[in-house]
Amino acid sequence: MEHLFALVKDGKIKVSYDSESFLGFYELAGLEKPKEHITKRNRGTLTIRNDGVGVGKLFIYRENRVLSPNHTTVGHIVNGMELIDIAKEGEFVTVKSEQERLMLLNKTQAEVKNILSEAGVEHIIDGLEDDDAVIVEQTPKHTIDILKEGKVTTKAIKKEDLCTIKFVDNAPRSVRYFKLLSGLLENPVGQIKIHFAVPGMHIVIFEGDKKAAKGLIPENNPVDKVIRGQIGITNMASKSVGLIGVRFEDNVEFGPTAENFESTNIIGDITSDYDHLEKLKEGVVVYVAESNNESWVR
């Protein structure tokens, strides 16, 4: 169910594909999900592909289809089936769920207290208790588990410690890789772990995933120089494909992951104050969120 919630943005969901028998929503394709609730795929049923080609894709059925163990049922259309019948690829469908998502990440502690109070859920705070602190972790992660247990534990950090990033539009594969690796595809706050950091080097490199980075073609390579605060990813032109990095000073030779420009894909700019990142050590987790603001400094 959380997978479905993650697809809905501002109460709407974008159609990726339409056919006579179903609508497809493919934004989270590639995210592996467990086999859970398997039922007949009757008209109005919502399923998520849990195995094989197209894993992670959401389907809403216009016609009855046979039961498949590769599809997990996550819901059923109650009202508005006529909108599903006429929706076309590229259009948006307004969605209202009987149960709203209890997603607390990237909200302040004060906001979360009110949300959980209204939901009748006990709030357990782990660590920082300031009202203006930003929630970066919640346990359980999923709405259905929070409601079942009647309580949730949250971890917060100071607002200035949250690393916000404005992503570019001309490196779609690389941006998606970063969001997949960090968890930003499904959640408003993600995590990346420091792989390499040496004082005085003015660079921090984060862990990657070679398997997920397979096929990461060159896109949005630097031209004349890399600017401080830019986030870069090593592409498939290098053996270190998938590594993520940031530089704290401009460089005319090497990218944010210490690779040449041909092996570097720039995915965005850090828009928050990032000087403290240079002081962090290997193994430290950095919390990240997407931003629409411009970089705070150049």
Model-derived features: where do they sit?
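Cyclophilin-like peptidyl-prolyl cis-trans isomerases
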Residues: 1-298
